[in-house]
Amino acid sequence: MSLKCETERSKTWNNFGNGIPCVLGIDEAGRGPVLGPMVYAAAISPLDQNVELKNLGVDDSKALNEAKREEIFNKMNEDEDIQQIIAYALRCLSPELISCSMLKRQKYSLNEVSHEAAITLIRDALACNVNVVEIKVDTVGPKATYQAKLEKLFPGISICVTEKADSLFPIVSAASIAAKVTRDSRLRNWQFREKNIKVPDAGYGSGYPGDPNTKKFLQLSVEPVFGFCSLVRSSWKTASTIVEKRCVPGSWEDDEEEGKSQSKRMTSWMVPKNETEVVPKRNVYFKERHMSNILTF
């Protein structure tokens, strides 16, 4: 199970700019799909290189075709002159990490997962000795709240959180391209750990719930007992609905506690004044199996 997320960095990310004031932009790709990872990217560039960034052709990744996005991303990785203008770092959040975050007892929303990824990337840039003086972020959730959160964490840095940042700021456009190309590549070249996964001849598509190929893949690949493979975000309503309809019903040991408070008063563990002994409640596991304590051997 892939629940770890490592920061991936381009060649010139460490000590980028050698102390020159830089702007950092953040964007993501793959927030909405039911298949594949969500990729967060941060791009950095000297403040005085805005024109050069535009000349590179960066734009909102959704406004560029696949060939153009890959051309720009390849230059970011292979052209030594371009690497002096821009560097980037990525965090690739697996479907399993997303699902586990959203389904665990203390639920962690997708917005919280996204914020953590962005904050980790900013901290990584600072730890790698990048002189970040401005940050531009494409908003996730209420922008004022998000901006206030970042300003509290990173005082002294000018921060702008806004909608459509990927089309307003070239540095965010560059981050958008890095995230989108990486996400598409990881999805296209996905290696299944599970055996005998049924993939339609036309493939599993873009991963978005409305994609006909994605819909077909979900219907074909669901396993009656174990549900979906690691490519699928099981926390998505699209996936959970199929599981409810197609999979064998199951129950968990704590089902009988559903709807009841999981917390107890501290005094509930103490012996009441009127009783000499407290009989602990038997776990449902032992009840269902008619198991008893052995008092003598």
Curated annotation (Swiss-Prot):
Cite the EC number: 3.1.26.4
Q: Which GO terms label this protein's molecular function in UniProt?
A: metal ion binding; RNA binding; RNA-DNA hybrid ribonuclease activity
Provide the top EC class. Answer: hydrolase
Q: Which organism is it from?
A: Caenorhabditis elegans
Q: According to its UniProt record, which protein family does this protein belong to?
A: Belongs to the RNase HII family. Eukaryotic subfamily.
Q: Which Pfam families match?
A: RNase_HII
> Keywords on this record?
Endonuclease, Hydrolase, Metal-binding, Nuclease
Q: Which GO terms describe its biological process?
A: DNA replication, removal of RNA primer; mismatch repair
This protein is called Ribonuclease H2 subunit A
Q: What does the record give as cofactor?
A: Mn(2+); Mg(2+)
* Signal peptide annotation: none
